[in-house]
């Protein structure tokens, strides 16, 4: 079976009750509808993938190369494009150009991997960014409480090693959370209720894919 995936929008978090009346924290994801605009094959492209398009956009805002691609696929222009990698044998049999994908491709109780862009935190110090302990709060410490301390030797090695954890921009990274449980699929509203937290801000773009390290339940 081909790996399944869909683009969607994170709508926020809420809580629901399961069959045992226990509270379950869930993230609400508006999944799709997506449309297949291109199928990559090993013979032509060197790998197998399916290209998904999602979100409304004015045709005036789409450049000519993408307009031609949408026209060839016979679909209206969309705001977002993303590729879902597949096994070599899956692309031609499971998907067709112009096919529409909705939240119903997933089932209650299945496991998914969710990819999104984490919230940007701006310029952050080492205590917030890397969890450094910091320095003394008293006993003669003067204005060094949140400083990182030494970042390297002087004469030897006379440089700062690459990868040294220092202050800098934090967040706004591509993050994937693995093996999240789909608590419920609301096919009528095109919504997935995913147990736990999902990367990114409310209103952010996410990709929901069937879990790669866990088989279908």
UniProtKB/Swiss-Prot annotation:
What name does the UniProt record give this protein? Large ribosomal subunit protein uL3
Top-level taxon: Bacteria
GO CC annotation: cytosolic large ribosomal subunit
- What SUPFAM superfamilies does the annotation carry? Translation proteins (SSF50447)
Q: Which UniProt keywords apply?
A: Ribonucleoprotein, Ribosomal protein, RNA-binding, rRNA-binding
Please explain the role this protein plays, according to its UniProt record. One of the primary rRNA binding proteins, it binds directly near the 3'-end of the 23S rRNA, where it nucleates assembly of the 50S subunit.
Give the source species.
Mycobacterium tuberculosis (strain ATCC 25177 / H37Ra)
Q: Which family does it belong to?
A: Belongs to the universal ribosomal protein uL3 family.
This protein's gene is called: rplC
Question: Which BP terms from GO are recorded?
Answer: translation
One Pfam short name: Ribosomal_L3
MF terms (GO), sorted A to Z: rRNA binding; structural constituent of ribosome
Subunit details: Part of the 50S ribosomal subunit. Forms a cluster with proteins L14 and L19.
């Amino acid at each position: 079976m081909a790996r399944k995936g869909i683009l969607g929008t994170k709508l926020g978090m809420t809580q629901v009750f399961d069959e045992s009346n226990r509270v379950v924290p869930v993230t609400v994801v508006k999944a799709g509808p997506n449309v297949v605009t291109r199928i990559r094959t090993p013979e032509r492209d060197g790998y197998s993938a399916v290209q998904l398009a999602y979100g409304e956009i004015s045709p005036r805002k789409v450049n000519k190369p993408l307009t031609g691609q949408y026209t060839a696929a016979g679909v209206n222009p969309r705001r977002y494009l993303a590729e879902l990698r597949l096994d070599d044998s899956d692309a031609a049999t499971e998907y067709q150009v112009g096919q529409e994908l909705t939240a119903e491709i997933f089932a209650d109780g299945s496991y998914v991997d969710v990819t999104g862009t984490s919230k940007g935190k701006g310029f952050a110090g080492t205590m917030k960014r890397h969890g450094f302990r910091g320095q003394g709060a008293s006993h003669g410490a003067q204005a060094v409480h949140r400083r990182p301390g030494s970042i390297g030797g002087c004469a030897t090695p006379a440089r700062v090693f690459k990868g040294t954890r220092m202050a800098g921009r934090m967040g706004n990274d591509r993050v994937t959370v693995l093996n999240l449980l789909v608590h419920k699929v609301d096919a009528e509203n095109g919504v997935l209720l995913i147990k736990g937290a999902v990367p990114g801000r409310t209103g952010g773009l996410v990709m929901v894919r069937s879990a790669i390290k866990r088989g279908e339940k």
